[in-house]
């Protein structure tokens, strides 16, 4: 126990060393209960977290604050500035609230476990992963800031008042967004105080930015960390003197050295063991390139939560938002942001009606236009850096530094330019060998399951084709089960994988009897307070139950094996304690068949129609299956797209496989042209080749008949007019003869 306590004291969290008093440390295993994703990134997520014996539901929404060109800067041994190469994630920062507590706030990072702050109206809890831990264990602790007398700001000195605000609702803001781009400099002493580890310090500055962001949510402001600078070995300016002197010294330095790094505000964060001042800025000068700066003094008596309040107050002052006169201003909570006491209080802090009015006044003026610049906040935000070993935008290749490149067996890439060597087509990839593309038809990703499909090199790309698999809902496992995401969700295999030989999927009576008991033997879920019962229609989707026909006792690590005799059959199941990382093994897997046209989904037996399985065997001429793109994957010797034509010796596949049919197929088959530079382009081309074309031969057959008919009509017309002319001439001649034969008087 003593070792564990020392370990906990060394963990990095929302506070540094003795910044704040931790009350009783609690341990919890957060449970994810909801998640919504977009583009492979969770945009909304909810967790159940146990705090002081009570469960709370925390709802979170992604809150990005790093721009696409974000960089961390340091200095080389010669004193020249250089970018520091570190892995950053811009998609694992969230902001939200605790369900049922309208005046709550949650600021959480999920990059490595849950790390952040849970703020109720007047109390804050820190949460961070327990390291090392086998499971998803976290520790939760209440943060109680220590009292301190350092609360005076140089540019706007305000008397610290102990009188309470008059509480009144604040009018809502108009629905528009503003953005503050912030450059932060961490001086040497603070870098050491935060752990003297670049990764740890960066993580804490990210947390600080997230906390500051949460404060400005009510004003529809997003605080962007545009860039970060670490003074690791030495400070670039003296950091002695009071905050006012340091502020003028810093803005003078920033005018010369931060010209090329865009920002609305630049902050110097300085560590002081004790200080009468905790910050300084120029009031109302945020968008001024000469005076848009501030200094925050981080003393040993404040937490990261308190430092976020200091940053928020400095940003507010720089927008012309003064401290509150608590005799005139109204606060929607106990303490508002622009009260010096906010630095030493826990819980959610909002802006008073005076602050809102001052903010609206500031953004109505032309000098606030810098806040309307919306940075690009892509999750993939890093600019390309040649030599870091990762191929980024604008690079053909990147083998690392010159030494690493020279050590490779095939030198396909020029280390200095990140371009291919002359004559090289590739340097890495499943379909690249000796700097050249592997010929078409080579299997680059073999199938791993009867519901998975081979992918092949296409001969024109270093990348293997996109992973494709049999369409969800296709029967498998001797037509007893269904394919889901390239895996046959086979109940028999689930039992074998856990219990080994001698086991099989339990019959219906085992599920009906045991999973309706709502105890260790069978249930539809485990919570911190007990079991979730199975309804009669969901009994086959709760605890996984298997039959066992051997006499040996089964042992499963960290689990209890439950035995039951049901109508002469031994039915067995597992039980893990709540929060165990392997507890998913004791449930029937999603996608397992639970009835006619029904499958298990989230421990419920639901209609399988949501899989949208629509592959009729006749679509592929009974010679193939549909893949997840709903294209036919043909059996060997049959050609896509519809498996209608044959080509003896061809291994089979689809228009998505990469092994497109040969350029000269057997007689009777359609002709193919081998064109394409990438897997996607080639797929489009082949699909167009196979697309049916309108029949045109009747048109060409009709043309000769049409010409003959036209000639015939022209001839008849000519004959008609010729004969008419002859008749007219004959009539005229007859009249002349008749007149000549008449007697004269």
From Swiss-Prot:
Signal peptide: 1-16
Top-rank lineage group of the source organism: Eukaryota
Topological domain ranges for the Extracellular compartment: 17-696
Description of post-translational modifications: The signal and the metalloprotease domain are cleaved during the epididymal maturation of the spermatozoa.
Keywords carried by this UniProt record: Cell adhesion, Disulfide bond, EGF-like domain, Glycoprotein, Membrane, Phosphoprotein, Signal, Transmembrane, Transmembrane helix
A UniProt-annotated Pfam family: Disintegrin
Region listing for Disordered, in residue ranges: 654-674
GO cellular component, one term: plasma membrane
Tissue: Expressed specifically in testis.
Residues carrying Phosphoserine: 739
SMART domains reported in the protein's UniProt record: ACR, DISIN
Limits of the EGF-like domain: 611-644
Protein name from the UniProt record: Disintegrin and metalloproteinase domain-containing protein 2
Gene that this sequence comes from: ADAM2
